[in-house]
Amino acid sequence: MARPKVEAGVKLRGAEKVARIPVKIIPTVDLPKKPDWIRVRIPVSPEVDRIKQLLRKHKLHSVCEEASCPNLGECFSGGTATFMIMGDICTRRCPFCDVGHGRPKALDADEPKSLAIAIADLRLKYVVITSVDRDDLRDGGAQHFADCIREIRLLSPGIQLETLVPDYRGRMDVALEITAAEPPDVFNHNLETVPRLYKAARPGSDYQWSLTLLQRFKQMVPHVPTKSGLMLGLGETDEEVIEVMKRMREHDIDMLTLGQYLQPSRNHLAVQRFVHPDTFAWFAEEGYKMGFKNVASGPLVRSSYHADEQAKIAKAML
């Protein structure tokens, strides 16, 4: 296959997206059949409908909808939502992720105010702000995160804000300096998988770099809980998961999420196993023994799953 030409603003998906990563992705013939314990209820409620209508009104897209999150109904009904800023084109090519790759367009200077107005209109209580990777920006997008936080707090003073940030590769010092000046209520960065699988699952990322990012933020802003998460089912062993959890605690990470990886398409990394709910429960027990303030562990758990409740518990224990 000829390498696709990457033009600004054009998203590469599927086979085109993973064409240049160091590990060849062989398309699966069929997507694996999900076990009985992975069942998603269609979210239906007046509050869910209200939030969806307002999202359309403000021309916003929540990660909850874009990723077809199984917990959308629970979160929307509870006044929680996750928004992606800085566009929908990522500079990385992670083959587990369904976000398009390419050369992003310039940042929208009006986005912080527009997002703040929309969140105030939605009457949300807890908001998670995440983003694509922006390796094209000198600060990795940290200032844009800070601008969004500031504008949202101006219009919604009582709101709780969690940021799920990229790894700020090569830009950690400047990014953390900006973040510490306008810190969120929870600082989240996902390790995603065990170090042995980084080359295949997170090309361009570094396991120790991500751990250091979380630890250094905690050292700079000790009163803000730190959080990270893993997807299970990419080929890791239970022993490797436990080892990563130990390393997280050594780097002062307060909160943990563990969920099942679900293959977005035939051109993404294949699911190697479906982890049983009992195993997820065991991981949670081990996590609390290690000293995590809160552990959300289950097949349908995602990074922002019950994020408001997690944050409340973690802050009470700091």
UniProtKB/Swiss-Prot annotation:
InterPro entries: Aldolase_TIM (IPR013785), Elp3/MiaA/NifB-like_rSAM (IPR006638), LIAS_N (IPR031691), Lipoyl_synth (IPR003698), rSAM (IPR007197). Pathway: Protein modification; protein lipoylation via endogenous pathway; protein N(6)-(lipoyl)lysine from octanoyl-[acyl-carrier-protein]: step 2/2. [4Fe-4S] cluster 1 binds at residues 64, 69, 75, 304. Its main location: cytoplasm. One of its GO terms (molecular function) is lipoate synthase activity. One of its GO terms (cellular component) is cytoplasm. Residues 76-293 form the Radical SAM core domain. Transmembrane segments: none annotated. It is found in: Cytoplasm. Its EC number is 2.8.1.8. It catalyses: [[Fe-S] cluster scaffold protein carrying a second [4Fe-4S](2+) cluster] + N(6)-octanoyl-L-lysyl-[protein] + 2 oxidized [2Fe-2S]-[ferredoxin] + 2 S-adenosyl-L-methionine + 4 H(+) = [[Fe-S] cluster scaffold protein] + N(6)-[(R)-dihydrolipoyl]-L-lysyl-[protein] + 4 Fe(3+) + 2 hydrogen sulfide + 2 5'-deoxyadenosine + 2 L-methionine + 2 reduced [2Fe-2S]-[ferredoxin]. [4Fe-4S] cluster 2 binds at residues 90, 94, 97. Binds 2 [4Fe-4S] clusters per subunit. One cluster is coordinated with 3 cysteines and an exchangeable S-adenosyl-L-methionine. Keywords: 4Fe-4S, Cytoplasm, Iron, Iron-sulfur, Metal-binding, S-adenosyl-L-methionine, Transferase. It comes from the Bacteria. Its cofactor is [4Fe-4S] cluster. Disulfide bonds: none annotated. PANTHER family: LIPOYL SYNTHASE, LIPOYL SYNTHASE, MITOCHONDRIAL. NCBIfam families: lipA, PRK05481.1, PRK12928.1. Belongs to the radical SAM superfamily. Lipoyl synthase family. This is Lipoyl synthase. The gene is lipA.
